[in-house]
């Protein structure tokens, strides 16, 4: 996944079978959350169309994404504040549908990142000291600090285990709602020759429930200062926002996803109105419209 992974299906009966969060220690809470997240990930075969706004140092995109088990079809509405005409949108999709190498690369990166995320999830209980910092009727907030006796098995784990931060858990479904963290010291590889991530490098992720037992990533914020690339599909500086989730058939093909993302009535581009009114203002870029609460693409 291009960190579009998080097509995680929580099995409702499994979640309900666990005891309440507040009867557990913080370490037990996080172990339970990890078990539920990993189980959901293994059982999730759902596909979704969603609206994505992505910011990287040299690129700003607004696009509809139709995810499948063989990759994701992207309908780019706006690139670097310039709206793409519909014929150009179709051309780019058509090019992707005929580019087997690009499809395989996308799937390879997604599989790599999924494995890495699963490995890091498994480390959460042992890699950190957890303390409860607050709770509501629906969520529990935890703070994490590095466990002094933990020995990270990989380079990625070493970076992960050097972070401190906070995590919010959904009390009923035992899912991660939010997690954020930052490095509290520089992390170097090979004495700095092979890479370095600087203190205060940070990340933040948010998930939202998009169906009765379906959760998806809704925000990704990565700000890593340095030159050690961890995830193949995530930039060292990246901010993604995802919304307007709509389900697709579980067995949808790339070709079918392309039709859905172009023809779905609710997926209208943020371009010009059908008939321009004399003296009217030009349409706002998609990025601005997404920020408006009443925006319906």
Regions found by a protein language model. Give the residues of each.
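Bacterial N-terminal signal peptides that target proteins for export
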Residues: 1-10
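Intrinsic low-complexity, intrinsically disordered segments enriched in polar/basic residues
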Residues: 2, 16, 283-284
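Bacterial N-terminal signal peptides
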Residues: 9-17
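Structured extracytoplasmic
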Residues: 23-164, 172-177, 182-201, 206-211, ...
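Beta-strand elements of repeat-based all-beta scaffolds
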Residues: 206, 217-219
């Amino acid at each position: 996944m291009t960190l579009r992974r998080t097509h995680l299906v929580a099995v409702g009966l499994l979640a309900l079978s666990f005891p309440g969060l507040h009867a557990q220690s913080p370490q037990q809470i996080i172990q339970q959350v990890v078990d539920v997240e990993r189980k959901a990930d293994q059982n999730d075969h759902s596909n979704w169309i969603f609206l994505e706004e992505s910011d990287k140092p040299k690129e700003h995109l607004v696009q509809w994404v139709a995810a499948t088990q063989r990759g994701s079809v992207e309908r780019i509405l706006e690139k670097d504040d310039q709206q793409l005409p519909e014929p150009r949108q179709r051309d780019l999709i058509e090019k992707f549908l005929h580019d087997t190498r690009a499809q395989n690369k996308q799937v390879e990166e997604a599989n790599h990142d999924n494995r890495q995320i699963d490995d890091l999830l498994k480390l959460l209980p042992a890699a950190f000291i957890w303390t409860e910092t607050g709770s509501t009727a629906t969520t529990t907030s935890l703070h994490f600090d590095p466990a002094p006796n933990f020995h990270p098995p990989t380079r990625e784990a070493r970076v992960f285990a050097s972070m401190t931060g906070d995590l919010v858990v959904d009390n009923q479904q035992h899912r991660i709602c939010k997690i954020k963290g930052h490095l509290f010291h520089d992390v170097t590889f090979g004495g700095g020759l092979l890479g370095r991530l600087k203190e205060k490098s940070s990340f933040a992720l948010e998930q939202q429930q998009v169906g009765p037992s379906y959760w998806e990533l809704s925000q990704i914020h990565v700000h890593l200062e340095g030159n050690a690339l961890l995830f193949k599909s995530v930039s060292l500086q990246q901010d993604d926002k995802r919304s307007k989730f709509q389900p697709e058939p579980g067995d949808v093909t790339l070709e079918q996803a392309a039709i859905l993302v172009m023809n779905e009535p609710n997926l209208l581009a943020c371009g010009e109105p059908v008939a321009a009114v004399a003296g009217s203002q030009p349409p706002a870029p998609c990025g601005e419209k997404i920020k408006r609460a009443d925006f319906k693409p």
